[in-house]
Amino acid sequence: MVGKIAPIAVDAMGGDHAPGAIVQGAVNAARKGLPVVLVGPEARVREELARHRAASSLPLEVHPATEVVEMHDHPGQAMRRKKDNSIRVCFELVASGRAAGMVSAGNSGAVMAGAILVLGRPEGVERPAIVSVLPALKGAPLMLDMGAVVDCRPIHLVQFALMGEVYSRRVHGVARPRVAILSNGEEDTKGTDLTRAAAAALRRAPIDFVGYCEGRDLLTGEVDVIVTDGFTGNVALKTMEGTAKVVGEYLKRALRSTTVSKIGGLLSKAALEGMKKRIDWREVGGAPLVGVNGVGFISHGRSDALAVENAIRRAGDAARTHFIDEIARAVAPSHALLEVPADGAAAEQGPTPRRTAPRQT
């Protein structure tokens, strides 16, 4: 996407490979014209920057933060007691307008706590959510929540759907996102009290709600926004990550098993590399937060330079759309949607039937 924005603030001390991989990713992004401000202990960050040739000529600056949130720190306490920590300072730069967004591969709970504490929430938003972009067969479907709210109420799922629809439309450019709730079946009788209440409300929402989707639908790309509670979403995401890793290992072993398979592997190298890139979590870079007054991305703790660079790029893309301006308007009717009519008809009808072609068997 085009258009100049303020720098993206990057937590230089977050993640297993900080500050080396974080600084490398920031340098790579800056070399592609993306303005970046690295936040962390100034001497240490500048020492790492000195390893990179001509870094001083890049759109890259350093902003000091004297404290670091460790992975074992309690998120809320760390935000309040370590007031000059790199995560909080990143959010302060966003809140002041000196940064267009922030990226951190550090303590995800601390990132969420910092976002709420420093940025606050748009009017009407009950709880923010973490969004994941799935490596589907087509499109770039979103799933939320991925762990911010593990014990959800119907209002949370309804607002996740409305916020996810805005993000899909404004940031990913989907003209009319198809929204579904993750469940254990497509039938009206499936799901839980939580999902049925949320589905009944979303039937009345001004979005393209298509009802329930199942776990097998996550990577097909048939829907654009998949809504679930944070516990289920986090388990689903890590299951997909683990499955991709195991399938990749099976494939490598199979291609090395015989001379013929090795030749076949060489002939298929380009296709295999394309597939590998498609499912590589580093290509996504990070998970955006929705429901806070600013752009924030949580990157994987194992992020390397490629993941950090992509997270910076995606944060910049999100900031350019100003999608946050629409969040408050989107969630405004959420409580009214949950008000069941006197005859109870909406609640009894359950989710809207899926508007997709019948599955071939």
Curated annotation (Swiss-Prot):
Pathway assigned in UniProt: Lipid metabolism; phospholipid metabolism
UniProt cross-references to InterPro entries, sorted A to Z: FA_synthesis, Phospholipid_synth_PlsX-like
GO molecular function: phosphate:acyl-[acyl carrier protein] acyltransferase activity
The UniProt record lists the keyword RNA-binding: no
Reactions catalysed according to its record: a fatty acyl-[ACP] + phosphate = an acyl phosphate + holo-[ACP]
Keywords: Cytoplasm, Lipid biosynthesis, Lipid metabolism, Phospholipid biosynthesis, Phospholipid metabolism, Transferase
GO cellular component: cytoplasm
Swiss-Prot/TrEMBL GO biological process terms: fatty acid biosynthetic process; phospholipid biosynthetic process
Region (Disordered): 342-361
Subcellular location per the Swiss-Prot or TrEMBL entry: Cytoplasm
NCBIfam families recorded: plsX
Protein name as catalogued: Phosphate acyltransferase
